[in-house]
Amino acid sequence: MREEQKGAVKNSIGRIFITALLILIQVVWLIELFIRLNKYSTGISLVSSAIALIVVIKIYGRDMNSAMKMPWMILIMAFPVAGVGIYLLCGHSGVNIGIRKHFQALQSELTPLLPDKEDILQKMSDEDRQTANMAHYISHSAGYPVYDNTDLEFYPEAVDGFEAQKEALKQAKKFIFMEYHAIEDAQSFAGMKSILFEKAKEGVEVRLIYDDVGSMGFINTDFVKQMESQGIQCRIFNKIVPFVNMFMNNRDHRKITVIDGQVGFTGGYNLADEYFNITHPYGLWKDNGVRMEGDAVRSLTVMFLEMWNAIKKTDTDYTAYFPEITYTAKQTGYVQPYADNPLDDEHTGENVYMNVLNSAREYAYFITPYLLISDEMKKAFTLAARRGVDVRIITPGIPDKKFVYKATRSYYNRLVKKGVRIFEYTPGFCHAKQCVSDDKAAVVGTINLDYRSLYHHFENAAAFYHKDAVAGVKADFDHLFEECHEVTEQYRSHRSTALRIGQCILRLFAPLL
């Protein structure tokens, strides 16, 4: 197994190097071409400047977060040719028209398979308008209904969720769907892989999706062949190619498992050793997961099938994947799985978090590996705190990306000055993404408090209301606060001019990180 891991790393380093080198050559060649043309032709120089100005005006007029516009406008004005090229590569979602239409067609095909749960929304409204409004937004703006008749268990430790997941996989009778940002063909996945192989031999349909960038360095290029040789259908989302690719900035960050359309898992952990503290690259790794059983799993099934067919359209009849559920839940309360798509204009992940803050009356607690947020999100945090809500955010004590960590800390001062309390997870790196408010509502999923998750990636989460698991999330936060170091006062103090300027620059370009 160790030799396989070394081979995977070596293979991935080679792929990354060759791909980056070829893309760099293309970009440098284009820039050099324009520079030379500008040098020898005043007309071309004027044309390139005019194009840069038009692009800046177009960016300014786009219906997007203002914090996303500013760094692009500055970059293009400072370096017209290179700036426009980088923007078209990484920042211009409009170039993905074909991909956007493909996803829209799939959504039109699959959305009718989601049930109309207006009666449940009305029931929630009669019981508690505060949580009903949150559920109403997800249902009517994102298109994912809220369900009752669903049992949900929260796992504050990723390893517990992983073990429960393996036990559930052993019970599969018809199909298994799995979609993950990162898979590492190492110790943690070995046990799960043997279960999947055995299930495939039994005739269970097994499908697996992983993101190419997320899994790079973790698996060999022959991983798909290995899976398919054992009867497992395997697809790679958004393969990295050595050519300028305008879609490569959008990654599949989701974590979904569906078993027979009745049992589902999601949360923060990927299928790699570091998530279960088998390895410790950044101290103790904090992550989480949820297990759901019942009606709400239907939404996870739709999410997976959308991504599966987005990679390659093969399904024409979805009937077999939506069996009639005869399960009767033991718990009361409501569950609402939902997804976020960077190709539409509805920033569901960000809006759900802001709704949690805007509706909170007593407290709102968040944990995130990165804190790179828009002015709108920052305002939601500070307004809640100024209303007297106990607002707290937990970030890592040991970072996985030092530059991003510096950018994360650059947001502390403005938040703590308005009453938000900041805690750093002393034992290591917190990869969990969860929030809870007022003992009524909680969200657990894949969505970080950063621009990549909120604007660029395909994400998913589960909101749940008036469930026992809400108390479980709250208890997890209470335990985490004991393990954390509060840095509120430290970052409330006066900062030097040099530090303030540096942090302003970090925040300015945070949307590009």
Q: Language-model segments: what does each one mean?
A:
Residues D340, I367-T368, T395, Y425, ...:
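Thr-Gly-centered strand-to-loop micro-motif
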Residues A380-A384, S410, D478-H479:
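Short, solvent-exposed amphipathic alpha-helical segments in soluble enzyme
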Residues Y370-V391, P396, K401:
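Helical hairpin unit composed of two closely spaced alpha helices linked by a short loop
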Residues M1-N351, N355, S359, P399, ...:
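N-terminal localization/anchoring segments of enzymes in phospholipid and broader phosphate metabolism
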Residues K433:
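Catalytic-core elements of nucleic-acid end-processing and repair enzymes
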Residues E376-K378, Y405-A407, S437, Y455:
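Histidine/acidic-residue-rich catalytic or RNA/ligand-binding cores of hydrolases
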